[in-house]
């Protein structure tokens, strides 16, 4: 999973920090059987969502739902419930929580039309659903309501990044960190540096984010995983493994740490361990990226039937996300292009994705789909455009190399394949072996 996906997930929930520490909250006290008065139910939910470690549970959501039933026009509780549903989605992968979040936040705005936290909640929901133009509108509205606050700039900057408006996005991130240095703001600075090719600077900013986590378990684990991803992308396998294991120790059972450990083990060639850890991760949190990794690992291990089962699950997850309003064209186009599924339809899917997300990764998705469809001359400009920021992403390098080879430029193909492997020798379970074979490497 590319880091931008993880950052969008984090972005979609980080704004909840101002609402009682929703990010990474825990169930501090389980309710006894029977109904509770509204005030007591809400107090329980607030304790359940406090930043004391662990993760949000369905019981906390239930407590907020009880409070809303007792006081249906309590805008504050409706907003907290809206964010809680988003966090529940993040923890479980169950996209049916997203329409519930929208309903709760819309109800809060009906009660209190200029509730800035409700507007931010809808902005974070739009990011989750990949509705980036809507997210930008909500972020700017929240900025007008919260003059001098850092929080709206996260939503604004994240939306601008996905819309390919990089100077404005990076300015938003700089403004955010100047207003409030925090895990959320440092993580965005790190991503901006990564996009512009400054991977060492990105790691430095992520270490500031780790310090800002202050030992809070989920925030610490998340930051450790992101630093591990950076190290793995730079070929620092030992450091990446150590950090992934530290993340699992900081928050036992954390699926993101487990899937990152699977990536590291795959890079080492330890497919048995990678399959084991990927299975555990997707059993806890079945994401498209995690399941696709497991399918690729099973294929590499010579277990095609098991791999097919996982690929079917990817399709089911995609359908469930779409049913809950999440736009998955970009991710679906990349997945299908990788596997050469209906190339012409994949090109059209990639065109829609790029129209929605005219970023370097939108460019890459369209170029990759065109190259895999054999439309080489059309693919090259998009593949080249994907590197316009100087991003050091081995998969972007590989995709450009493939497009060059498709167009008959064999020397350029070999050059880009070599760059990809030099940057990260095991950059992809599926494509690193292809690059090595093309270069005559063992």
Regions found by a protein language model. Give the residues of each.
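N-terminal leader/linker segments that initiate helical-solenoid repeat arrays
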Residues: 2-111, 116-117, 137, 425-426, ...
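TPR-repeat structural position
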Residues: 57, 91, 98, 132, ...
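Short coil turns that delineate tetratricopeptide repeat
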Residues: 72, 113, 147, 180-181, ...
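Start-of-helix register in tetratricopeptide repeats
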Residues: 76, 83, 117, 151, ...
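Canonical tetratricopeptide repeat
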Residues: 80, 121, 155, 188-189, ...
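Residue-level recognition of tetratricopeptide repeat
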Residues: 83, 87-90, 124, 158, ...
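Register position in tetratricopeptide repeats
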Residues: 87, 128-129, 162-163, 195-196, ...
